[in-house]
Amino acid sequence: MKMAGWKKKLCRGHHLWALGCYMLLAVVSLRLSLRFKCDVDSLDLESRDFQSQHCRDMLYNSLKLPAKRSINCSGITRGDQEAVVQALLDNLEVKKKRSPLTGTYYLNITRDCERFKAQRKFIQFPLSKEELDFPIAYSMVVHEKIENFERLLRAVYAPQNIYCVHVDVKSPETFKEAVKAIISCFPNVFMASKLVPVVYASWSRVQADLNCMEDLLQSSVPWKYLLNTCGTDFPIKTNAEMVLALKMLKGKNSMESEVPSESKKNRWKYRYEVTDTLYPTSKMKDPPPDNLPMFTGNAYFVASRAFVQHVLDNPKSQRLVEWVKDTYSPDEHLWATLQRAPWMPGSVPSHPKYHISDMTAIARLVKWQYHEGDVSMGAPYAPCSGIHRRAICIYGAGDLYWILQNHHLLANKFDPRVDDNVLQCLEEYLRHKAIYGTEL
């Protein structure tokens, strides 16, 4: 009997010990689960949960873009020459084999918008309160290469921003339908209400932006600045970095605006007419309205909301808009001239001390072939590592380190058919910096 009682006590002791262990494990598990609790659908990276490295890692892994090629993007963004050479050699091997995503692909995948946004890794919540409180507007003028458009949209997308997309009327129907399918998945992305056929170097390129300006001003989104883009652009700053840069402008605009050369003055000396292309006539134009001095720049701007409003509503601005309609490449002198007009919000004086080069403005980073050379001998930048079109560098992987050293918000031109590795690394760099706040 004594032996049986001893066995019962022993069993009861083991039972209590095991129960205690289970309870201890449960408490530890609960504490760990609370410690590592991460809601990846949280609206703010500054929330308490996301202060932990674990949660940041979870979010980054859920949004990390799949690498198409095994290249050393961290090395490339830091200017490591071995990594750059390997990427350039890899590009020579694969660029003719790579098939871009097609309109049909996007028409199919966007039938399920949530699947499309998840699979293509769109960031679907504001990454900080500062960004939430400073929405940016985009005018996106595109005409071809649907994958380029979708990747550009993904790179600049944030749910608090607003995006107007203008598609060239002449674009193939499949392209138009694919763009419509993509933007139908986002409440803050829309097609311009009026579309025009865009002819190179003609007024229609400006009209496309003006149409988006009108639509964006009617939006309920209280955007602060407007950036305009084309299909060969790509951001080189995160949305958070853009917000910081735009705040530092303090209501000023940023765009190239310089005294025109004699050859560029010919662009508005005679009237131009448009058929399928733009051609000059023998009809001389009257001087610019309101004795306004003309300046030249490029098609890209960083413009305050007040500037945009005055482009459309100010009578003096409208007179200049009408006057440049029959000039050559009016987008390269309309914005540059309005930026020096004293009645325009955020403008700067016409005095030579206020001339702004494309390298000084933050709107767009471009490598011009005729400026490339030996930096140690005074050239503004080294030769293009990609190819040239119309004397503009189509960037290669060897340009990325230089690109990232500059203060511009976007760069031009990129083409994955020329070098997809530079885009892959830029996408990886921006996504990493957006989540972690640090470079690769």
Curated annotation (Swiss-Prot):
In its keyword annotation, does this UniProt entry include Nucleotide-binding?
Answer: no
What the protein does comes down to: Non-essential glycosyltransferase that can synthesize all known mucin beta 6 N-acetylglucosaminides. Mediates core 2 and core 4 O-glycan branching, 2 important steps in mucin-type biosynthesis. Has also I-branching enzyme activity by converting linear into branched poly-N-acetyllactosaminoglycans. Contributes to the post-translational modifications of structural proteins.
The record's subcellular locations are: Host Golgi apparatus membrane
The family note in this entry says:
Belongs to the glycosyltransferase 14 family.
Q: In which pathway does it act?
A: Protein modification; protein glycosylation
List all topological domains (Cytoplasmic): 1-12
Q: Keywords in alphabetical order, please.
A: Disulfide bond, Glycoprotein, Glycosyltransferase, Host Golgi apparatus, Host membrane, Membrane, Signal-anchor, Transferase, Transmembrane, Transmembrane helix
The intrachain disulfides are 73-230, 164-384, 185-212, 393-425
Task: Point out the glycosylated residues in this chain.
Answer: 72, 108
A biological process (GO) of this protein is: protein glycosylation
Q: Could you tell me what this protein is called?
A: Beta-1,3-galactosyl-O-glycosyl-glycoprotein beta-1,6-N-acetylglucosaminyltransferase
Residue ranges that the UniProt entry lists as topological domain Lumenal: 31-440
Additional free-text comment from the UniProt record = Was acquired from an ancestor of the African buffalo around 1.5 million years ago.
The EC number(s) attached to this protein equal 2.4.1.102, 2.4.1.148, 2.4.1.150
> What reactions does this protein catalyze?
a 3-O-[beta-D-galactosyl-(1->3)-N-acetyl-alpha-D-galactosaminyl]-L-seryl-[protein] + UDP-N-acetyl-alpha-D-glucosamine = 3-O-{beta-D-galactosyl-(1->3)-[N-acetyl-beta-D-glucosaminyl-(1->6)]-N-acetyl-alpha-D-galactosaminyl}-L-seryl-[protein] + UDP + H(+); a 3-O-[beta-D-galactosyl-(1->3)-N-acetyl-alpha-D-galactosaminyl]-L-threonyl-[protein] + UDP-N-acetyl-alpha-D-glucosamine = a 3-O-{beta-D-galactosyl-(1->3)-[N-acetyl-beta-D-glucosaminyl-(1->6)]-N-acetyl-alpha-D-galactosaminyl}-L-threonyl-[protein] + UDP + H(+); a beta-D-Gal-(1->4)-beta-D-GlcNAc-(1->3)-beta-D-Gal-(1->4)-beta-D-GlcNAc derivative + UDP-N-acetyl-alpha-D-glucosamine = a beta-D-Gal-(1->4)-beta-D-GlcNAc-(1->3)-[beta-D-GlcNAc-(1->6)]-beta-D-Gal-(1->4)-N-acetyl-beta-D-glucosaminyl derivative + UDP + H(+); 3-O-[N-acetyl-beta-D-glucosaminyl-(1->3)-N-acetyl-alpha-D-galactosaminyl]-L-seryl-[protein] + UDP-N-acetyl-alpha-D-glucosamine = 3-O-[N-acetyl-beta-D-glucosaminyl-(1->3)-[N-acetyl-beta-D-glucosaminyl-(1->6)]-N-acetyl-alpha-D-galactosaminyl]-L-seryl-[protein] + UDP + H(+)
In the record, what lineage is assigned to the organism producing the protein? Viruses, Duplodnaviria, Heunggongvirae, Peploviricota, Herviviricetes
